[in-house]
Amino acid sequence: RLTLIFTGILCAFTIGAQQPKGLKKLRAAQVSVLAYTAGGELQQGQGTLISEDGIVVAQYDVMKGATRATVVDMAGNEHQVTEILGANGAYNIVRMRMEPGKKKNAYLTIAPQQPAEQAQVFIMPSEKADKNVPCTIDTVTHVEEFGDGFKYLTLTHEAGKRQANSPVLDQSGMLIGFVQMATKEGQPSYVIDANYANSLKVKAMDAGNSDLNSIHIRKALPETEEDAISFIFLTSKKDTAMYMDYVNRFIQLHPANTTGYTLKAEQEAELGQYAQAAATYETALKQEGTKADELHYSWSKVIYNLSMRPDYKQYDNWNLERALSEVQQAAAITPLPTYTMQQANCL
């Protein structure tokens, strides 16, 4: 109760103080985050748009365990969260993307420089606060560096509980970071660098990242083709829908990369979806830039492996003769020892 009274006094004090420029417009970048677990439990928090194309920074503990999530903007429009771009449970931060709306998204621009000790900062009210509520003014008492030159600020006062993850601005209205609450009540709050939040990305080895895997929403693939393929190879196939989602996304991003099609067709065949697998191979063979020999070889292996299974009920002409034909086409394009060995297997 004393904390609430103090916060109220502090807010009242800030009414007469100079606020960041264009505060009412800046508040349009604040959003509500509604995350739902597999059991239907609702977890709520606030987020901040940091780009025009829908990148949102939210609290990790709100997104943990979620199978789907919705972002509600200041106009009341709902946007589905389409992918997780990065996460860190220790710092309670998630970077994610929401689907675009009909209008351009309002967003906060990250400040080019972090404040020094004794600098004033402005904590925005929660996303649900009245539009006339001013920022809470606080002072930086300590600046600590972590990671790749990122800053972690200690404030003078404890922020209100509703301001957890609230954006923190400088006088010009640019984004410094996000409020983090102290572990003990009554202790000063902290600000984590917005640049750190924006740096969170999915890497090739993150298929086993427990923080990311605790959020059951598709992760963004790593930026390079090689890293994206490594990520998919390391991803568990237990969640078939998620695995296929990654493969389809890879094909969408890299339509000339043969591996995406072979991964898709092989998984479809493994699931008994033979017609779909055949269609995937046919599509890939028509796609400019793909390697036809690798596609024919993959198709041959799929048919051969199926033919070796006692429970396999032949689909169309998928037999050893067809498997041999496919690998012969591969060898005619590129005569590799691997293809010769596969021909011997099929005889």
Where are the model-predicted features located?
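Alpha-helical segment of the N-proximal tetratricopeptide repeat
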Residues: 220-271, 311-313
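Flexible, gly/ser-rich surface segments that form the specificity/activation loops bordering the active-site cleft
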Residues: 18-22, 104-152, 159-164, 179-190, ...
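Short coil turns that delineate tetratricopeptide repeat
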Residues: 255, 289-291, 333-335
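C-terminal cap/linker of serine protease catalytic domains
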Residues: 19-20, 177-241, 248
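A conserved glycine-rich beta-strand in the N-terminal activation segment of trypsin-fold
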Residues: 19, 36-53, 58-59, 78-80, ...
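Conserved active-site neighborhood of the chymotrypsin/trypsin-like protease fold
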Residues: 51-122, 127-133, 157-158
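Residue-level recognition of tetratricopeptide repeat
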Residues: 266, 301, 308, 345-346
